[in-house]
Amino acid sequence: MSDRARAETGNGHERVVDTGLHRETTSTDGLNRIDAAFDRLRREGGKGLIAYITAGDPSYEATADLVLAMERAGADLIELGVPFSDPMADGPVIQQASMRALAGGATPAGILGLVRRLRERTQIPLLLMTYYNPVLHYGLAAFAADA
């Protein structure tokens, strides 16, 4: 954290903490982090940056480090791509990242564990971007419960 004091503002529905590096938005009225971030951006009249990374490429540890670096660099939300063995809707860069992640042992369960560990270090909104197939294989109810 920077030497700047944490300045807290809000409208009674959320708490925005400005550390000088990133504005952390957490909900106080049941809104999720994603809704709260977009609400904050609308009120400020600003644009948001949604960064993307394929989870597990090249490792879970590297993914966590990159997520935290993207947050420090100003990302408002971060999409974590869940690698899939047949990523036909993705371009070649994401296809190759998915293949590397899978070759390194990335799994949906491992990625959900990564998200839980990241939650201990950051409150930035995280979105999982995936194909239906890995979720179906994991089990729809189990995936929803674990996510």
Regions found by a protein language model. Name each.
Residues 2-4, 11, 27-50:
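N-terminal amphipathic alpha-helix/helix-capping segment at the start of soluble metabolic enzymes
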